[in-house]
């Protein structure tokens, strides 16, 4: 379609309509609401580095599993201590991957982190705080390398226009 110059013959729409399935909404019902309805979100993969060693000699290594654990605990303070109570924010560590053996201290650990916010300034603060905390914990743990941050799945705030929402609601109620 793009090769057929569709972009040139189509007019820019006045509004975009989308839908999202919510577990909290009963089947067969349609929910509408003006204003902010779905938070902005981003995910980040963080890789922290250690120094591998045998589990019987942990003093010879830098344990990235312990490092990842301290990062998870410290990240929990972002929302509770750095974001104003009137704001909405979430920081979730959804996965940690590290190592393959019970008696080997591995070289690295990976954390998969997701954030949600309704305010772009809060979202930016979450990003900065995650990086600050990860970097500081890496220094405290004697990590031999800088952490790696890979951002993905970035979604903007869904903020429904009042007039468009009213028009859609009227159509569903008809």
Task: Mark where each language-model region is.
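Histidine/acidic-residue-rich, glycine-tolerant segments that coordinate divalent metal ions
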Residues: 1-95, 99-104
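Metal-dependent amide/peptide-bond hydrolase catalytic core
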Residues: 66-174
């Amino acid at each position: 379609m793009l090769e057929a110059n569709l972009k040139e013959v189509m007019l820019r729409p006045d509004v975009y309509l989308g839908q999202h399935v919510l577990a909290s909404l009963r089947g067969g019902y349609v929910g509408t609401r003006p204003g902010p309805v779905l938070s902005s979100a981003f995910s980040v993969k963080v890789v922290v580095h250690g120094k591998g060693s045998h589990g019987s000699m942990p003093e010879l290594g830098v344990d990235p599993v312990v490092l990842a654990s301290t990062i998870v605990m410290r990240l929990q303070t972002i929302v509770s201590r750095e974001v104003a109570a009137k704001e909405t924010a979430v920081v979730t560590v959804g996965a940690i991957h590290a190592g393959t053996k019970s008696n080997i201290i591995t070289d690295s650990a990976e954390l998969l982190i997701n954030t949600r916010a309704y305010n772009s300034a809060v979202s930016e603060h979450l990003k900065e705080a995650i990086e600050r905390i990860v970097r500081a914990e890496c220094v405290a743990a004697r990590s031999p390398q800088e952490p790696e941050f890979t951002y993905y799945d970035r979604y903007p705030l869904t903020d429904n226009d009042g007039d468009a929402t009213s028009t859609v609601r009227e159509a569903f109620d008809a």
